[in-house]
Amino acid sequence: VTSRTVTLLDVARAAGVSKSTVSDALQGSGRVAEATRDRVRAVAEELGYRPNSAARRLRRASTGAVGLHLPATATRLDYYMNLAFGAVERAQEDGLDMVLLAPSGAAGGRIASRVDGLLVIDPEAGDSAVPGLLDAGVPVVTGERYLGPSAGPSAAVVCDNAASLTALLDHVTERGARRPAVLAPSGSSAWATALRATARSWGLAHGVEVALRTVPFAATPAEAEETTRALLTADPAVDAVICAPDGSAPGVLRAATALGREVGTTGGGGGTDGSNGTGGGTPGTPPEPGTVARSGPGLLVAACVDGPATRGAAPPVTAVDLRPAAYGRACAELLCDILADRTAPDTVRRHAWSLETRASTGSPG
């Protein structure tokens, strides 16, 4: 059996039942005793049986495709591109094509006839397309939970986003920060909501007032730079900035450089009179036109999303590696498992992240 493709008949013979019983047991249909169903599934797994995708689609009037819905701002973010590649690769292993859905509110009402299932990534409560997708009548897996009103998704793959920001805040504190700031994303996605809530709860738990600023979900480096300049000018005691949106950390570095802040340390490097090392004045104020900012009070910089922008920055930026390709693959795998009756339609799986410490927080690169 192991030298060729395992067939339904092979499973039936090994389990001592008919082909129709095997088919019903694996599809969750028909009148099959639970003990028999469990035995058939165990035998199928032991033999390495995989259903024929084409035959299964014919039996179920399947389209052979699944849909992928990304946030409207996703097209310019490296994170979502890698996530999509991972999802496509995994879907193809089950003989399924991946269809990228337009970010349109009208898509959900017609989608059930076009795809067998849906991946809805970082669903926003304010996204008009999401409710229709979640209620389209096909299995749905969300990448992070949907927090808006709906009948609810079929399943989800989630990250512990509260834990990842907690790890960043703990890290910069261990490196000497006493007044951290968080540039958290706006919006009502589970990721954005968790980061804002965690910044507040961490501050309360540690007796520290975290300077929380809200930036767009997909803030550009220029937007991050503007927000950081305003923050450090108004509150020069801030000695660590954690930037959430993908790819925006270089803007924080530019703001720090412009204001004479030495990235990678919390120690002062400026004048002994408490200036920012730019020739006098209030700490955190920009240098006079025509002058060059010298190394002033330190600033630790970190990011909630790792990627080329953080790894290639000068200095490289400490960041949370969310492993987007693996995450996309995990979402697609859960949907494939649901479509093939390998798992329950309300399954929730967790996805692991890692903290990559680099020179921007005084850590070896």
What kind of feature is each model-predicted range?
Residues 1-64, 365:
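N-terminal helix-turn-helix DNA-binding module of bacterial transcription factors
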Residues 2-3, 65-170:
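Alpha-helical recognition/docking segments in bacterial nutrient-uptake
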Residues 71-79, 102-107, 157-167, 182-227, ...:
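Hinge/beta->alpha junction and helix N-cap segments in small-molecule ligand-binding domains
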Residues 105-115, 224-236:
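Short, well-structured alpha-helical segments in soluble
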Residues 236-237, 246-365:
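Flexible loop/turn connectors
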